[in-house]
């Protein structure tokens, strides 16, 4: 019953958890009178967990169901009073035997748990299962169609995700991931990077009592192999954890690209057929620990080391039909060796001051990443004569220092402040050897930030949170090369032109405000409005004036060191409704972005009587976009769950000077998952995601989708499990694009219409078997430090405590 009104609570959840194995055994929902009768319970020792949305959880234990002793074989829980939670809700948790999906006021949390289709996979497989999140065939992560996403690991940037600000998740094993947090509109407390949102991947640190571990192995088609192991030891004062992983396998893909150039008096064409085999070998090791000087404080350290070796072999076949017949039936091949490693150090401290009112967090992290890429390429004409052979060797490094301190103080039940400061120092560099000549590209970015956020609950149902963040950014880029600029081809000409303009400096400061309003409609329905200012800073690829590829002269692309950051004003309205059986979340957002960074600045460069098309990043004038998204999770019975999500967007970009930038894009995305758990028999999971037909500024992208199937059988009291799965059942995970646009050659002033059709597939349908074995006590502590202050997140799991 309600502790205040004494009225019965309908649909309250009552779960019986086996204390010995810490497993959900049975449960149910109360009727309209608040009554529930559970029968057929196996004998044993249990804890009863009583929950309802908007109320504080209550546990009753121990319940000893043994004949002749303990509580007997019948047990009456009696009258249970639940207290209403405050307006600042912690989380709404959808509990079950399968992976747990948690919807809080400001973010979505996906606990990887026993997710089947991502078992033995990577971070990309995990993210594809999260509502409104997509990972395309190139590894680009987007939220509701927006690819300006910041990827974090344990709340910080990591070498595991690569040197780019957006990051890559393919190198993170799914077995190392505990949960994923998706934050679409965070407050001024957090970095403003990521107009589309923030994805925080939280790695496992060990939450089970005593000595525990896990070993898993995967074998699949195309020589796919995966071996992972995690071990942790936890006591009242200490938590030690370590993990290692190895992953390899061939990724076979192909593609076609067709161009037509329609002039007023003729039509030229170019056809390209591509085949590619990529074989990555990834090895990783992670070790760390948490020391608890008191019940309120934690001191932690983590060391993360990983290395990769990757071989990529590509073959391109060109057939050209042009006016001068300069290029006819050419075969082009490349071989790329990519060897790299990274090392991350993170030292963290947290103190809750023996209260629920104060919290101090601080951390220092250092990340070092190196990447050595050796590329060899050549081409042959239709007469099998060697037309061009060259080699490129690039050594890249990326160093990141991050220092942060955050303090929270809740002066009263309805008033709190958050204040903090953060320094981020980044140093990127590339040493490039091309045709025996040495070139250098160094880029430094230092960010100094401070913030203040205030939360005020006006009533039990209405609250607000306002904040401001100040940033000072210092950037500097410098290029170097041969003292004599003696260009030998179009590539060296682009190099020399960029070096002549070096160095490039762009210091700037900015204020980032945020404001959030929360209204609690009912005990299980909430309405929230949020506003924040975001930034998408140019990354290394969009800044570097050196060509991204020195092999394929038909697709020249380079960055622009004069790029300005793009700024967005983001407004979002969210409605959420949560009950034991049904959870609904709907949101709509509006973004107004200035100085949009795009890859559509088309220029023409002439060298040795040949004109080349060069695609460069540039700032468009303005972009306005609207977005709507929603997800539903329905549990018709305790052993089954259905999750469905969808999103759509519409964006319009304009620029007064560059017609290449003008245009409209829109599209929709969708996904879902069905989970069936038949006790003592098996678990079945069917999942899928995709996109509808997209319109972009220059054409269309046809619809595509992926469907995955997984079946798992457990043995030895759930310690051993065998999972069989098929990824992309219909082999439909392809990328197709069809474009047309009007082009004017700035050198010859000749106009034509360019038509392009392209189709690519990076990974074919594949099947695999995964073995997983858990050892040790496999039981959570009865008392958990993460619940000490009643706050969510914290350092224990690398989560981001977002409040609203």
Predicted regions and their residues:
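N-terminal periplasmic accessory domains that precede
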Residues: 79-80, 123-124, 165-168, 182, ...
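Transmembrane beta-barrel wall of Gram-negative outer-membrane proteins
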Residues: 219, 223-254, 266-314, 341-345, ...
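Face-selective signature of the C-terminal outer-membrane beta-barrel domain
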Residues: 284-308, 332-482, 486, 520, ...
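Surface-exposed extracellular loop regions of Gram-negative outer-membrane beta-barrel proteins
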Residues: 370, 427, 474, 481-494, ...
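Short, acidic, small-residue-rich periplasmic hinge/interaction motif at the N-terminus
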Residues: 4-5, 13-17, 51-53, 70-116, ...
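Short, acidic Ser/Thr/Gly-rich low-complexity loop/linker segments typical of extracellular
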Residues: 19-35
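Outer membrane beta-barrel strand-and-loop segments of large Gram-negative receptors
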Residues: 273, 391, 400-404, 438, ...
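Short acidic/polar hinge/loop motifs at secondary-structure boundaries
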Residues: 123, 129, 156-184
């Amino acid at each position: 019953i309600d502790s205040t009104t004494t009225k019965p609570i309908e649909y309250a959840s009552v779960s019986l958890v086996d204390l010995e194995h810490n497993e959900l055994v049975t449960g149910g929902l109360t009727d309209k009178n608040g009554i529930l009768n559970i029968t057929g319970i196996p004998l044993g020792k249990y804890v009863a967990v009583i929950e309802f949305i908007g109320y504080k959880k209550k546990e009753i234990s121990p319940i000893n169901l043994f004949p002749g002793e303990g509580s007997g074989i019948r047990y009456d829980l009696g009258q249970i009073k639940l207290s209403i939670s405050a307006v600042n809700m912690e989380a709404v948790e959808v509990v079950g035997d399968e992976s747990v999906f948690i919807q809080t006021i400001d973010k979505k949390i996906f606990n990887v748990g026993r997710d089947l289709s991502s078992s033995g996979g990577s971070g990309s497989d995990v993210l594809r299962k999260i509502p409104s999140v997509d990972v395309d065939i190139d590894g680009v992560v987007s939220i509701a169609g927006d690819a300006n996403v910041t990827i974090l690991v344990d709340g910080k940037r990591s070498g595991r995700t690569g040197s780019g600000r957006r990051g890559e998740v393919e190198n993170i094993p799914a077995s190392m991931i505990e949960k994923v947090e998706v934050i679409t509109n965070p407050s001024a407390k957090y970095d403003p990077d990521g107009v589309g949102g923030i994805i925080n991947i939280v790695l496992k640190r060990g939450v089970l009592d005593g000595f525990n571990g896990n070993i898993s192995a995967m074998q699949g088609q195309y020589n796919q192999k995966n071996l992972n192991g995690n071990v942790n030891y936890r006591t009242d004062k200490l938590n030690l954890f370590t993990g290692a992983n190895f992953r390899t396998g061939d990724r076979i893909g192909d593609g076609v690209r067709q161009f037509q150039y329609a002039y007023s008096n003729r039509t030229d064409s170019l056809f390209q057929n591509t085949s590619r085999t990529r074989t990555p070998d990834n090895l990783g090791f992670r070790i760390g620990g948490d020391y608890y000087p008191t019940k309120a404080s934690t001191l932690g350290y983590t060391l993360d080391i990983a290395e990769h070796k990757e071989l990529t072999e590509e073959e391109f076949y060109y057939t050209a039909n042009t006016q001068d017949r300069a290029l006819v039936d050419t075969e082009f091949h490349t071989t790329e060796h990519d060897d790299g490693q990274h090392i991350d150090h993170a030292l963290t401290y947290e103190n809750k001051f023996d209260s629920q009112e104060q919290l101090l967090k601080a951390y220092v992290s250092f990340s070092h990443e190196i990447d050595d890429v050796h590329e060899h390429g050549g081409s042959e004409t239709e007469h099998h004569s060697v037309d061009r052979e060259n080699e490129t060797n690039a050594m890249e490094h990326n160093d990141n220092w991050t220092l942060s301190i955050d303090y929270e103080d809740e002066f009263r039940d309805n008033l709190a402040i958050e204040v903090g400061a953060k320094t981020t120092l980044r140093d990127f560099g590339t040493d490039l050897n091309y045709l025996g000549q040495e070139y250098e590209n160094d880029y430094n970015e230092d960010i100094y930030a401070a913030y203040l956020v205030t939360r005020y609950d006006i009533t039990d149902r209405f609250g607000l949170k306002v904040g401001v963040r100040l940033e000072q950014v210092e950037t500097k880029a410098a290029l170097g090369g041969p003292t004599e600029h003696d260009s030998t081809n179009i590539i060296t000409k682009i190099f020399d032109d960029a070096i002549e303009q070096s160095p490039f400096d762009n210091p700037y400061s900015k204020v980032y405000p945020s404001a959030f309003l929360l209204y609690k409609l009912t005990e299980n329905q909430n309405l929230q409005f949020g506003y924040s200012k975001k930034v998408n800073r140019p990354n290394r690829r969009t800044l570097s004036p050196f060509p991204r590829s020195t092999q394929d002269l038909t697709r020249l692309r380079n960055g622009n060191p004069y790029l300005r950051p793009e700024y967005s004003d983001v407004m979002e309205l969210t409605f959420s409704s949560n009950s034991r059986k049904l959870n609904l979340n709907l949101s709509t957002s509006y973004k107004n972005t200035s100085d949009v960074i795009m890859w559509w600045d088309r220029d023409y460069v002439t060298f040795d009587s040949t004109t080349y098309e060069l695609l460069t990043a540039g700032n468009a004038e303005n972009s306005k976009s609207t977005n709507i998204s929603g997800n539903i999770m329905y549990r018709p019975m305790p052993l089954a769950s259905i999750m469905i999500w969808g999103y759509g967007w519409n964006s319009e970009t304009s620029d007064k000077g560059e017609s290449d930038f003008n245009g409209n894009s829109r599209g929709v995305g969708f996904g879902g998952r069905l989970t069936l758990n038949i006790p003592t028999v098996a678990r079945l999971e069917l999942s899928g995601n995709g996109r509808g037909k997209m319109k972009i500024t220059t054409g269309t992208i046809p619809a595509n989708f992926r469907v995955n199937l997984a079946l798992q059988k457990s043995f030895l009291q759930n310690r051993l499990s065998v999972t069989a799965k098929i990824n992309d059942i219909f082999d439909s995970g392809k990328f197709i694009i069809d474009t047309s646009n009007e082009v004017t050659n700035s050198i010859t002033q000749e106009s034509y219409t360019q038509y392009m059709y392209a189709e690519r597939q990076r990974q074919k349908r594949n099947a695999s078997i995964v073995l997983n074995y858990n050892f040790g006590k496999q039981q959570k502590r009865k008392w958990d430090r993460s619940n000490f202050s009643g706050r969510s997140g914290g350092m224990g799991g690398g989560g981001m405590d977002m409040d609203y």
